[in-house]
C-alpha cells in the first residue's frame, strides 16, 4: 500500500484526495470498531484484506459468537447413579444436537455453519466456544435460536440452569450498505481489467473490517491481494 502511494507521489500521477488507514486489530474482530471515520475524511473506501488477485468482495458473513456453559453435579462415581450430572457429557450431548452438515468442513458457497472453536471441562463445569456464520441474517438468527432451543431441552432433562448460552453479534453482511453505492464495484471492475485480470466476485466466507466500516457509514468493499490459504500453516502471498 505504501509503495503504491510512494509511486503516485514520485511519478506525479494525477489523483483526487486519497486517504490511507491501517487497522491493527482486524483478526480479533475489533479493528474498525473505534475507527475515526469523520477524521479519516473519505466518502468511500476499499479494504485490501486478503483474497485472490482480481477478487472484488462486497458480500460477507453475518457473524456471532456463542459461549455455552454447562453446570454439572459431581458426586463420588461409586454412588453416582441417578445423581451425578457430568458437565462434560452434557457438553458432548449439546454439540451432538447441532447438525453435522452445518460445520465449516461440510459447507461451502453460501452455506452457513456452527464452528466449535474450543471446548474444555470436567464433571463440574464445561464450556464450549462457537462462532456462527451465515450470509443470510434470518438463517443466522435460526442458528442462534436453535442453540437456545437445545439448551432449553437439556435444561428440561437435567434441571433448570444446567446449560447457559450467551450469544454476541460480531459483524454483519456489508451487501445492504454497498448496494446504494454500486459505482464502487463498477470502478473496481474497471481497475482489475486495466491490470490485465478478470474480476472475480463471490461472497466472502469470512469477515472484513470493511463490513464494520460500511455499517458505520463508510461504504467499503474489499479487494483481493493475491494471497492464499489464509489462517492456515500454508498461508502465503505473492511477492510481485
Regions found by a protein language model. Name each.
Residues 1-26, 66-70, 76-77, 81-101, ...:
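Alpha-helical metal-binding/catalytic segments enriched in His/Glu/Asp
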Residues 2-59, 103, 111-117, 121, ...:
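Acidic/histidine-rich catalytic neighborhood of metal-dependent amide-processing enzymes
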Residues 18-19, 43-46, 66-67, 200, ...:
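Structural motif
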Residues 57-63, 119-124, 212-217:
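Short glycine/proline-enriched loop/turn "hinge" motifs that connect secondary-structure elements
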Residues 58, 80-119, 138-164:
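Acidic-enriched catalytic cores of C-N bond-cleaving enzymes acting on peptides and small amides
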Residues 74-75, 132-140:
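A generic structural motif
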Residues 112-120, 131-136, 162-182, 205, ...:
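A short beta-alpha structural unit
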Residues 122, 198-240:
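Zn-dependent metallopeptidase/amidohydrolase metal-coordination segment
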Amino acid at each position: 500500500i505504501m509503495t503504491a502511494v510512494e509511486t503516485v507521489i514520485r511519478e506525479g500521477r494525477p489523483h483526487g484526495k486519497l486517504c490511507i488507514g491501517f487497522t491493527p486489530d482486524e483478526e480479533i474482530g475489533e479493528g474498525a470498531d473505534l475507527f475515526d471515520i469523520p477524521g479519516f475524511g473519505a466518502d468511500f473506501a476499499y479494504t485490501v484484506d486478503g483474497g485472490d488477485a482480481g477478487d472484488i468482495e462486497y458480500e460477507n458473513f453475518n457473524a456471532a459468537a456463542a459461549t455455552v456453559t454447562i453446570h454439572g453435579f459431581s458426586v463420588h462415581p461409586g454412588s453416582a447413579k441417578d445423581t451425578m450430572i457430568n458437565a462434560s457429557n452434557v457438553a458432548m450431548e449439546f454439540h451432538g444436537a447441532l447438525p453435522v452438515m452445518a460445520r465449516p468442513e461440510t459447507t461451502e458457497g453460501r452455506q452457513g455453519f456452527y464452528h466449535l472453536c474450543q471446548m474444555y471441562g470436567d464433571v463440574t463445569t464445561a464450556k464450549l466456544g462457537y462462532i456462527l456464520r451465515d450470509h443470510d441474517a434470518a438463517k443466522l438468527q435460526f442458528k442462534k435460536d436453535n442453540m437456545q432451543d437445545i439448551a432449553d431441552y437439556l435444561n428440561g432433562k437435567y434441571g433448570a440452569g444446567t446449560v447457559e448460552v450467551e450469544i454476541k453479534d460480531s459483524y454483519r453482511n456489508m451487501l445492504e450498505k454497498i448496494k446504494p453505492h454500486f459505482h464502487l464495484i463498477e470502478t473496481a471492475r474497471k481497475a482489475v481489467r486495466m491490470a490485465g485480470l478478470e474480476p472475480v466476485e463471490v461472497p466472502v466466507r469470512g469477515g472484513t473490517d470493511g463490513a464494520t466500516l460500511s455499517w458505520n457509514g463508510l461504504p467499503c468493499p474489499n479487494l483481493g491481494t493475491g494471497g492464499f490459504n489464509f489462517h492456515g500453516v500454508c498461508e502465503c502471498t505473492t511477492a510481485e
